[in-house]
């Protein structure tokens, strides 16, 4: 048995396929989904979703959103998403360094919040790209 997964971003359908297992970055921590999971609606955080197809794990960066599972159908609505295969690790590491510098230079609360969000996104991209190459 498999899960039917559909990841939808505002500009495109990122993923529409079957998988055996999913690990989601929910707002309360990592959430594992297997076939036969109870119906659920959950908020997603910025982070790396891991999809197991056959015996291979594929990381996908999610930029927050919502996930609904019912009858082995997982629908994920996200603010943005990026497959690890599309991420340049050196560029992602550079973006993380830049975001970290922005946070240390931030003086207002707004600047700190924006820099923190950039760091979270950059960390997720580095994590996904690293996982894809190992």
From Swiss-Prot:
A Pfam family of this chain: ATP-synt_DE_N
Major localization class: plastid
GO molecular function: ATP binding; proton-transporting ATP synthase activity, rotational mechanism
UniProt keywords, alphabetically: ATP synthesis, CF(1), Chloroplast, Hydrogen ion transport, Ion transport, Membrane, Plastid, Thylakoid, Transport
Compartments it resides in: Plastid, Chloroplast thylakoid membrane
Any one Gene Ontology cellular component term annotated for this protein: chloroplast thylakoid membrane
Membrane-topology annotation of the record: Peripheral membrane protein
HAMAP family: ATP_synth_epsil_bac
Function: Produces ATP from ADP in the presence of a proton gradient across the membrane.
Subunit structure as annotated in this protein's UniProt entry: F-type ATPases have 2 components, CF(1) - the catalytic core - and CF(0) - the membrane proton channel. CF(1) has five subunits: alpha(3), beta(3), gamma(1), delta(1), epsilon(1). CF(0) has three main subunits: a, b and c.
Cited PANTHER family: ATP SYNTHASE DELTA/EPSILON CHAIN (PTHR13822), ATP SYNTHASE EPSILON CHAIN, CHLOROPLASTIC (PTHR13822:SF10)
Family label: Belongs to the ATPase epsilon chain family.
Protein name per Swiss-Prot or TrEMBL: ATP synthase epsilon chain, chloroplastic
Source species of the chain: Pyropia yezoensis (Susabi-nori)
């Amino acid at each position: 048995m498999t899960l039917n997964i559909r990841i939808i971003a505002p500009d495109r359908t990122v993923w529409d396929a079957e998988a055996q297992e999913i690990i989601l970055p929910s707002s309360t921590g990592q959430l594992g989904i297997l076939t036969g999971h109870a119906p659920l609606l959950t908020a997603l955080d910025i982070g790396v979703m891991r999809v197991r197809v056959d015996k291979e794990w594929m990381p996908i960066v999610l930029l927050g959103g919502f996930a609904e599972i019912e009858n082995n159908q997982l629908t994920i609505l996200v603010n943005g998403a990026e497959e690890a295969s599309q991420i340049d690790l050196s560029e992602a590491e550079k973006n993380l360094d830049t975001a970290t510098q922005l946070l240390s230079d931030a003086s207002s609360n707004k600047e700190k919040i924006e820099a923190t969000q950039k760091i979270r996104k950059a960390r997720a991209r580095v994590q996904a790209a690293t996982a894809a190459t190992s």
